[in-house]
Amino acid sequence: TVQLAITGIGSLDEHDSSFLRAGLITRADLAVLRGLGAVGETAGRFFDATGQTAGIEINRRVIGVELEDLRRIPKVIAVARGLTKVPAILGALRGGYLNVLATDNITARAILSLASKAVESH
C-alpha cells in the first residue's frame, strides 16, 4: 500500500494555471470550472472551496488517483506557494487531501487569514 504521496496544488487563475499552460484544459473549461465553484486542483482533480468535487464533471476525464484515495494515504505532502493559490490550498486542506504543506511564509499567512475570515462569517 502507498504510505507517502507528494503532490502540488494548482489554482484556477488564468495566469497561474499549469493545466491551462500545458493545454490540458481550455479557457472555456476554466470558465466552466469557476462557474461550478471550483477553486483549485490536486492530483489532477478539481475541487471547490470546501474541498468537494461533486458536480465537477471535468474530473471524469482524469485517469489517476481519486481524491478519496488520497485521503487514505498516511502522509500526503503538498507543495504550493503564491497568493493566487491560497483559495486552492485552503480548499485542499478542508477536503483533507494533505497533511503536510510545504509553502512560504507569505502564502501561509494568507491561508490563515482567509481561513479566519471564513470562520468569522459563519
Q: PLM features: residue spans?
A:
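Conserved phosphate- and dinucleotide-binding cores of soluble alpha/beta proteins
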Residues: 1-122
